[in-house]
């Protein structure tokens, strides 16, 4: 799913390039004569996409990350619940997770509805960039909550079957990954917002700042 969403962003960035190339051009400054603004915008989007692809590639090669470590923690948590038959504990924990995810999804959709009304002067591509990030964030948060709800019904039923217990573990891992993606798409909103507020140069700066922030946040937790 992450690859499909990244591909959609790259397509949107390419559309932005074509749209900018087809619009009437004003007299370019000396700096713009060397670096076209649309190229700067596409570079910012490509930088974010490249970072995500590289992180996924490192994880597949065995490197630890926050996302990978937390996914393993979900598996350990499921096994603890099955071993202790802590159904009430599991339901309470899942309820907290469902509440958090649904709150985030509704908040993101509210922000999206409010922001679209304030972007009357922006281009269609800029508005679409903001809306796509917000919708992707809300969707992944809501899907994470859906899987948690499904796991809550399945926990006691799957206790006596090893194959079903493994299926519950996979559901919890997928729920965690969707929650992680929800936050990641919400952070990505900073890139089109910077594009709207400060132009292509600001969007590139925001893209570089986001990758530095992600590089810090994606490190695996280390016991002190």
Language model features: what each stretch is:
Residues 26-39, 224:
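N-terminal plastid-targeting presequences
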Residues 54-93:
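Membrane-interface amphipathic/juxtamembrane segments adjacent to transmembrane helices
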Residues 4-21:
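N-terminal chloroplast transit peptides
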Residues 64-80, 150-172:
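Juxtamembrane inter-helical linkers in multi-pass membrane proteins
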Residues 88-114, 177-203:
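Transmembrane alpha-helical segments and their cytosolic interface motifs
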Residues 122-149, 201-224:
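Alpha-helical transmembrane segments and their immediate juxtamembrane interface regions
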Residues 34-37, 118-125, 196-202:
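Membrane-lumen (extracellular) interface motif
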Residues 37-66, 104-114, 127-149:
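Hydrophobic alpha-helical membrane-embedded segments
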């Amino acid at each position: 799913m992450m690859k499909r969403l990244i591909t959609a962003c790259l397509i949107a960035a390419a559309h932005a390039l074509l749209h900018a190339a087809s619009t009437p051009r004003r007299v370019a400054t000396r700096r713009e004569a060397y670096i076209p603004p649309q190229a700067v915008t596409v570079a910012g989007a490509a930088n974010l996409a490249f970072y995500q692809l590289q992180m996924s590639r490192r994880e597949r090669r065995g490197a630890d990350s926050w996302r990978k470590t937390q996914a393993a923690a979900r598996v350990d948590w499921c096994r603890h619940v099955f071993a202790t038959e802590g159904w009430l504990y599991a339901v309470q924990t899942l309820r907290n997770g469902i509440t958090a995810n649904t709150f985030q999804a509704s908040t993101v959709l509210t922000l999206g509805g409010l922001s679209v009304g304030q972007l009357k002067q922006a281009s269609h591509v800029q508005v679409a960039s903001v809306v796509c990030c917000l919708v992707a964030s809300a969707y992944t948060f809501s899907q994470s909550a859906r899987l948690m709800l499904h796991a809550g019904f399945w926990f006691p039923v799957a206790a006596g079957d090893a194959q079903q217990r493994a299926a519950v573990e996979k559901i919890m891992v997928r729920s965690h990954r969707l929650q992680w993606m929800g936050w990641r798409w919400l952070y990505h909103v900073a890139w089109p917002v910077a594009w709207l507020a400060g132009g292509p140069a600001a969007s590139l700066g925001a893209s570089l700042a986001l990758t530095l922030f992600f590089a810090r946040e994606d490190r695996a937790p280390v016991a002190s």
